[in-house]
């Protein structure tokens, strides 16, 4: 198994657990921005520790900073919408599969922007992804 696959699986479990914690928090009706801000502060602390351990200089560029800000805005909006859906009575077993379709958007954008090849395997994956969401949300 490649390191990329291993790290992808680690991310799968970490994000899955994060989503479960969001659902776990919703019965107490938290104010979503405060919950997500605490989560964001925790993110900054963990990334700072990783940065210190790696002893790599902090570097950025205007382009990279712009991409990070746009990504932060999108992630904040997506997190807030997901959390709001859960706190408004959305079942995790329905909300998470729908939100999980975000990989299709990222894949389509990668194909368009980076000219990645469209393979039969990817097309079948898209079809199965959509079909799985239909089954999981009924």
What is the role of each PLM region?
Residues 48-52, 111, 134:
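Membrane-embedded alpha-helical segments of multi-pass transporters/permeases
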Residues 102-122:
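C-terminal transmembrane-helix exit sites in multi-pass transporters
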Residues 11, 99-102:
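Structural signature of transmembrane alpha-helices in multi-pass secondary transporters
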